[in-house]
Amino acid sequence: IVLVNDGSTDENSLNIAKEYTLKDKRITLFDKKNGGLSSARNVGIEYFSGEYKLKNKTQTIKENSLIEFNIEGNNPYEIYTVYKSYKAFNNEKDLGNFTYPNIDYIIFLDSDDYWELNCIEECVPRMEGVDIVWFDSIGKIEIDKYNDWYSPLKNYFYKKAQIITPYTWLNDSIKLNIKGFYFVWLGMIDFKYLKSIKLKFINSIMHQDHHFGMLLFVQAKYIYIYPKSLHIYRLRDNSTINMHNIKKQDIPPYIYNIFVSFNENMYLTREYFSVFSMHIILIECVKFLNKYNNEVLNSLFKKAFFELLIVKIFRIFNFNKDPKNIKKNMKYIYRYK
């Protein structure tokens, strides 16, 4: 289990994470600079991939204490400290030998959300021979205007457990007029598969689960559809999708210049940042498809999802300011319009 404290301005959040880490030796806690959801998730991927070298800062093991580690060398996300419970080590020699565990599968969970108690047990046996298990989610919405949220799986009307291919997924998307897709906490992923396609989350944007989900599914061999609700999605005031009510001190650093450009209007900042994020996502999808050697899937992918991405990007013309120079970099869009 990996917990990531992404530079929370609420110190109590880190303290709570430390309490859980102390109690459960399975947990590894990363405390890092605020970099957003993508960077937090990428820390987990990179840790389990063996991309970090850990050096113990704590020299002696004391009961009821946390063992602290530093990252040596490559530390792109500015991880301050890595914490582990004393229970995970038998002696001081173990501290110097601590490294990442080998995992078969990875599953993501945001701090607001939670799983049904049997989620992992339900997923693992269904991972046999597939790259992804895609399950359903129930919304627990605390904001009135998002009360109509429902999970992407429901859009596809899959009523029974089945195994599909990317061809089926894309053809169903087109047939059912599903123009947008996202995936991150809605299932379990084979970790060898994830590493083999070298897919990570785009840093410093929102809607990163759209890019991640689309590229994850289109490259899969088989996807297990499990239309059972194993996840509870909570939407609260400071969720990324509802940045309108975020406090000034909680604004991520990669958004701050936009916030200033729009005279500290959080609504305009959020709307512009959404356009910018879709712009980056489309660019990265185009780059991927230009290298992906499957003409049929490439064509289906564009037909299914490019229209909505382009429509959302064209909202840029609703703004009289353009701090990220989106309008100057839109020539690539017109070939797909």
Indicate residue ranges for each PLM-predicted region.
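Nucleotide-sugar donor-binding/catalytic module of glycosyltransferases
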Residues: I1-N257
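C-terminal subregions of glycosyltransferases and related glycan-biosynthesis enzymes
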Residues: R234-K337
